[in-house]
Amino acid sequence: MSTDKTNQSWGGRFSEPVDAFVARFTASVDFDKRLYRHDIMGSIAHATMLAQVGVLSDAERDTIIDGLNTIQGEIEAGNFDWRVDLEDVHMNIEARLTDRIGITGKKLHTGRSRNDQVATDIRLWLRDEIDLILAEITRLQQGLLEQAEREAQTIMPGFTHLQTAQPVTFGHHLLAWFEMLSRDYERLVDCRKRTNRMPLGSAALAGTTYPIDRELTCKLLGFEAVAGNSLDGVSDRDFAIEFCAAASVAMMHLSRFSEELVLWTSAQFQFVDLPDRFCTGSSIMPQKKNPDVPELVRGKSGRVFGALTGLLTLMKGQPLAYNKDNQEDKEPLFDAADTLRDSLRAFADMIPAIKPRHAIMREAALRGFSTATDLADYLVRRGLPFRDCHEIVGHAVKYGVDTGKDLAEMSLDELRQFSDQIEQDVFAVLTLEGSVNARDHIGGTAPAQVLAAVVRGKALLASR
């Protein structure tokens, strides 16, 4: 008969119950209960393996698995009583299992520790989250390709230092976003490979004395490999840090997209219009239509950056193997994944619906001497050194600033005062269409290259 003074699974060594505040302070069930499905998945695989190696009978295995499936149904129906005094998702499920099936439920934890159990749960959860995030990236990229194809010939100003630089097509600009997201996709796929390694079987830190078959459990759970060292298996959180790093880069990209959309929807730019369903108004200013979705995505990027910093700080001082500090890994990881997925979903819904204002974009591209480089290149083709051409065009631009004329608005005589190499054919070079069409190479802004890039992009998405 037990003489424990506590109802905890580890209570045998203790002579008094945990302080009520300490129980609440140390409990993680309020946030780690979202791991229930993966915890049950891991337990079913563990029970299956224990039966295979003779630690459990087939009947015990079946009873445990039936009980776990019933518990999952209770949780999903909202009929499960989560108890803080049971600390975490693992002990809540195990206690309920024992309530349902009796002493057999107490055999499930044979050859296992919560240390390798939680490490397995998190990896299973994150693996699924990465798959969902990858799907949202692909959906957003599909929207970008569709917009880029429609806007392959829409001319807008390209910027450096947020100053007019050269004409580009709107489709070309959208494809820059596509390229960033392709790198994000690759990083997350790579992260998933290292996430998909199984720590289960490491037990507390040194392994277990039971004749477990880790390869079988690995196969049952769909992991690619077994963690090769039990100390590292229970204490490794590199995969979570790596995910938050990849998520941070992706959120940085979305934040940059957001900044451009905020600028472009302003009265000062008016390049694009966002549908009302992605905006909100003001409680005092009746005229306002605020781009809340991109603004919030821009703001939420800081949450993900904070998660990365938090996890790095969490891990930097820990000796091997598991420490209670690691309980703090879940909330930043969960929040980073939720934030990235929600932000991608918002953009994937919004991007296909944005409406470019072609005339305003074109008019903006006509300002700021955007074809100055084209004039310099024209002179280079006439045999002049580029640095001399740069100087000549600089003088022409200064003249344009003083007279209020763009280069294309100057007469041939006005242009020839800066170089007698300039002829009538220069005006074809100085048009917006001439400028973008001249950049007809892989990665260039020419409409033909934009359409070719769209074809390559569609092939990339189809190969996933």
Curated annotation (Swiss-Prot):
<comment type="similarity">
    <text>Belongs to the lyase 1 family. Argininosuccinate lyase subfamily.</text>
</comment>
<dbReference type="InterPro" id="IPR009049">
    <property type="entry name" value="Argininosuccinate_lyase"/>
</dbReference>
<dbReference type="InterPro" id="IPR008948">
    <property type="entry name" value="L-Aspartase-like"/>
</dbReference>
<dbReference type="GO" id="GO:0005829">
    <property type="term" value="C:cytosol"/>
</dbReference>
<dbReference type="InterPro" id="IPR024083">
    <property type="entry name" value="Fumarase/histidase_N"/>
</dbReference>
<dbReference type="GO" id="GO:0004056">
    <property type="term" value="F:argininosuccinate lyase activity"/>
</dbReference>
<keyword id="KW-0028">Amino-acid biosynthesis</keyword>
<dbReference type="Pfam" id="PF14698">
    <property type="entry name" value="ASL_C2"/>
</dbReference>
<protein>
    <recommendedName>
        <fullName>Argininosuccinate lyase</fullName>
        <ecNumber>4.3.2.1</ecNumber>
    </recommendedName>
</protein>
<dbReference type="Pfam" id="PF00206">
    <property type="entry name" value="Lyase_1"/>
</dbReference>
<dbReference type="InterPro" id="IPR029419">
    <property type="entry name" value="Arg_succ_lyase_C"/>
</dbReference>
<dbReference type="InterPro" id="IPR020557">
    <property type="entry name" value="Fumarate_lyase_CS"/>
</dbReference>
<dbReference type="InterPro" id="IPR000362">
    <property type="entry name" value="Fumarate_lyase_fam"/>
</dbReference>
<dbReference type="GO" id="GO:0042450">
    <property type="term" value="P:arginine biosynthetic process via ornithine"/>
</dbReference>
<comment type="pathway">
    <text>Amino-acid biosynthesis; L-arginine biosynthesis; L-arginine from L-ornithine and carbamoyl phosphate: step 3/3.</text>
</comment>
<keyword id="KW-0055">Arginine biosynthesis</keyword>
<dbReference type="InterPro" id="IPR022761">
    <property type="entry name" value="Fumarate_lyase_N"/>
</dbReference>
<keyword id="KW-0456">Lyase</keyword>
<dbReference type="GO" id="GO:0006526">
    <property type="term" value="P:L-arginine biosynthetic process"/>
</dbReference>
<keyword id="KW-0963">Cytoplasm</keyword>
